[in-house]
Structures are given as C-alpha cells and as structure tokens.
Swiss-Prot record:
UniProt protein name: ATP synthase subunit beta
Translocase among keywords: yes
Keyword Nucleotide-binding attributed: yes
Compartments where found: Cell inner membrane
Species name: Thioalkalivibrio sulfidiphilus (strain HL-EbGR7)
Catalytic activity line of the entry: ATP + H2O + 4 H(+)(in) = ADP + phosphate + 5 H(+)(out)
Keyword terms: ATP synthesis, ATP-binding, Cell inner membrane, Cell membrane, CF(1), Hydrogen ion transport, Ion transport, Membrane, Nucleotide-binding, Translocase, Transport
SMART domains: AAA
Pfam families: ATP-synt_ab, ATP-synt_ab_N, ATP-synt_VA_C
Annotated family: Belongs to the ATPase alpha/beta chains family.
InterPro entries: AAA+_ATPase, ATP-synt_VA_C, ATP_synth_F1_bsu, ATPase_a/bsu_AS, ATPase_alpha/beta_chains, ATPase_F1/V1/A1_a/bsu_N, ATPase_F1/V1/A1_a/bsu_N_sf, ATPase_F1/V1/A1_a/bsu_nucl-bd
One Gene Ontology cellular component: plasma membrane
EC number in record: 7.1.2.2
UniProt membrane topology term: Peripheral membrane protein
Amino acid sequence: MSAGNIVEIIGAVVDVEFPRDAVPNVYDALRVEDSGLTLEVQQQLGDGVVRTIAMGSTDGMRRGVTVANTGAPISVPVGKGTLGRVMDVLGNPVDNAGDVQTEERWSIHRPAPSFDEQAGSTELLETGIKVIDLLCPFAKGGKVGLFGGAGVGKTVNMMELIRNIAIEHSGYSVFAGVGERTREGNDFYHEMKDSNVLDKVALVYGQMNEPPGNRLRVALTGLTMAEFFRDEGRDVLMFIDNIYRYTLAGTEVSALLGRMPSAVGYQPTLAEEMGVLQERITSTKKGSITSIQAVYVPADDLTDPSPATTFAHLDATVVLSRQIAELGIYPAVDPLDSTSRQLDPQVIGNEHYDTARAVQNTLQRYKELKDIIAILGMDELSEDDKLIVARARKIQRFLSQPFFVAEVFTGAPGKYVSLKDTIRGFQAIVAGEYDHLPEQAFYMVGTIDEAVEKAGKLK
C-alpha cells in the first residue's frame, strides 16, 4: 500500500503524486486519509502523477493531503445481503438499516462473458402491457430500451414493467438509478415495499445531484450485483433508469480529463463506454440477465449520438412518442416506431405475428390517409378507407391501458392483460367484429370484453 499527496484539484478531478516506483494502476481505488473519500485512477500522467475522478464531493479538499492506494479497483458487496437494501455507488447503505451483510465483495470492473459462455434465448417474457406484448415482445434474457423525450412516461412505464414482471417473476431484481431524481427513487422504494417485493430487489442509487464519478460508476455497481446472481444460476432482472445520464456523466468526466469532445460535445469514447456496460449485460449458460433500460432522448431526436449508440445493443426498442401522449393515449408507445427481434413467426408463432402485422398495416394506412382527411375531410375517402380509419382509431384507443402504478393519479384500477387476450382482442378489431361499437369504448380498458361492456354502458 503506497501513499501519495494531492497536487491539483479541478472540480471532480484530482491529481495525486506517488513515488515513481509505486504508481497505482488505472482503475485502482485510492482513499483520501482525511475525509475517507474514494478516488478512482483514470490516467497515468507520468512523473508519478495519476489523474483520478472522485466518487463524492471534493468540497473542502486541499493540496498536500495524504492519499493511500488500496491496490485494487472499487469493490462492492454482492449476494443475498444486498436484497431489500438501498446502496450508493460504493455499496455503502443509505437506508439507515445497518451494514450490508455479505460474504463476498466483487470488483465493479469485470470482463464481459466470452463468446462461448454466452447463451441466446427465444423465450418470451409477458409484461401484461398490450402494446408491448403485441408489437415489441421482450425476450427472456434480452435487452430492452424505453426511448422517450422529457415527460412522455419513461419512468412510469419502467415502474409498471417492474411491478408486473417483478411480482409475476419469482427471481431477483436489481435496480440502478443512474442520475435520476431522488423523488423517483423514493417513490420506487415505497412502491416495492407496498407490493411486498422489496426483499427480492437490490437498489443502487446515484442521483442527479451526485458528482459525475458516482453517476458514471453506479450502473457498473448495480450490474456487478446482478452478475453475481446470474453466475449463481439465477434468472435476474436488471433495471437501469437512465442510460442517457450514464452517457452524460461520461461526457462530464471526459471534459474534466481534458479529452477533445466529438460530435454534439459527447466524449470521443462514447461507443466504447457504452459497449463496456452493455456487453456485460448478457445471459450465459449459467443464468440470464433480462435488462430494461430507460433512455432519455434529448429534444426528441432519436438520431442524437447517445440514443443512436444505445440502439445497436438492444433486442427490443419501445419508443414513446409525444404525439401519442398529446392524444391522451397512455402508455404513449409508438406502434410503428417500436421494434423487436422477437417479432418473427418462428419465435412467436403465426397467429401473433399476423395479428401484429395487420395492426401495424392498418395504423400505417391511417397515417397515410391523415393528410387527405386534413385537406379534403373524411367524406372524400372511399368506403374501404373509411372502414380502415374507423378500425385504426379503435386500435389506437385499444392500445391504451390503465396502469397499476398510475392508480393514484387516475383513480382507475390497473389492468394486466395476458398475451392470449391481447391477440384475441386485436384480431377481432382488425377482422371487423366490433365495427358497430363506438371508438370511446376501447379507450383505457384491459381486455376486449371490457370494451364490449363499456360500449353497453355508453349507449
């Protein structure tokens, strides 16, 4: 264990000088003697000086303070002791419930599983949300991204998925809150507690008020905990909210480290940093990690480098649209933009595939007719097109659904719709079996039977 002294402090970046024969390795954790603050080595500058990023506030720090090298990367507790606990980036508890009791600690920097260790899966994961199960089904052991701009419902969708999957799924879950609001973290904790699934969830938070070092590493902390459960042979759920903040923390750190920015001011190592995280979120022959990640889309621009880099790593993309949210249709999932690799007749079966494609074709045709309707009005359409518009509007409304986690806002009880009921409902609408019902009957209901019942009340 060598010791050095602080020579320069620029915000979250701290330069430390060590004896030349005892320079720490990149990613080694250093400990500041006075405050107990942890620093992570990012660069070796030469002449015994290393540039580090602080895992906490550098307020009140001064030059000359002694820093000890721990000789190892940051390690965090892993195992059953993490379940039901709220921890920070270093694995320290923040829930006032005593120390986290685990037998092992793992380094947060680990190699991704090798090619021959990985295992693919085509098994579907039912979410109980109609639009997702029908048009962008999730694979067990797959990676899913929830893309959306500010205020279109990423976190609410994420919480509904956690509620539906974590309650139905008997395994363990890990939630990494990366650079999000403390209020949302608090809401999520109480939601889990009220649902009695807190004892199966490990929570790791690095909120948006934390220094960039915390926000950059907190996703790796959560992932390390999930990897331990996977390597034990379990099926783990990994939730990350929000991947964009991980990228943003990387941008802040990159600028502080003096790297030249690339497109739109992002770090030049954007693709590599994203790859380091995403390549580790994978299923092996021992167990699986199914990950659901919220991705903020700056200014609703899906071609921005951050969301564009994330797209390449995902099996399914759920795109939330502001135009659909403006219509009052929640979840505001864009049925034409959202995609999944699972949407293949060999994986999901012909009935599901044909229904999904028929729904998308109807909605696409309606989208094309909207210009004609806006200029000439509905009366100028042919009878066939009028029928398509009527069915498309019913489909659009039937894609909405009341959420369990939104009960407190809407007063409407949440609905979980099985895949079988979802396919049956959309098949019937596309086939014209419900052409006689008003479109309002399909808004904010669960199954098609509820829509028929609602139509009876509307008459």
